[in-house]
Regions:
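N-terminal low-complexity, acidic/polar interaction/targeting segments
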Residues: 1-187
């Protein structure tokens, strides 16, 4: 399913509910399946499904209950299903890198005031860099313990930015290292 990020961003008001996660970094132009079972996050999903389906994911800082990294990703719910238990399964797509300006507690969850971060996604010598990146990505994934079918990735349809972010998302890196990759200014 192709989504139009520019169209989705038209409904962005400058703030979004905050998913502060202790062990996950989301990247723009990637998608991820979530099982939502905590009451606070179920309330967020219930609320945003009634509006623009936007929320932001930020990695919690080490051993912190409430402090989050300033840089995260604005996400859009592509697909969701409410289970009989009240839990949700959903697929979210990373839309744009964001910076948190302020956090307001309005309900049982936080709403973050956000700035969209414009990235330098111009890649010089695009084809050569893509080829090197694809080869490195395939060798790293093949050498990991992950059981990933690399044939499902159509690299001809993937931008260099998307490929870089996909690699950052699925490679077996520490979350702090993934956060550092998310905070980089360009591909």
């Amino acid at each position: 399913m192709m989504i139009d990020n520019k169209e989705i961003l038209k409904s962005f008001s400058g703030s979004a509910p905050l998913f502060a996660l202790p062990n996950f970094v989301m990247f723009p132009k990637t998608a991820y399946n979530f099982n939502v079972f905590e009451p606070k996050y179920k309330e967020i999903i219930s609320d945003i499904l009634k509006t623009n389906k936007l929320f932001c994911i930020n990695l919690k800082k080490d051993n912190s209950k409430s402090e989050v990294n300033n840089i995260g990703t604005l996400c859009y719910i592509i697909e969701s299903k409410k289970l009989d238990s009240g839990n949700y399964t959903l697929i979210a797509s990373g839309i744009k890198k964001i910076r948190i300006n302020d956090i307001n507690k309005t309900k049982s969850y936080d709403i973050a005031k956000l700035d969209l971060i414009e990235e330098n996604d111009t890649v010089t010598e695009e084809q050569l860099k893509r080829k090197k990146l694809i080869n490195k990505f395939i060798s790293l994934v093949a050498s990991s313990n992950e059981n990933i079918n690399l044939n499902i990735i159509d690299t001809s349809m993937i931008s260099t930015e998307m490929l870089t972010n996909l690699g950052s998302l699925i490679l077996p890196l520490e979350n702090e290292d993934k956060q550092k990759l998310l905070e980089l200014n360009d591909v």
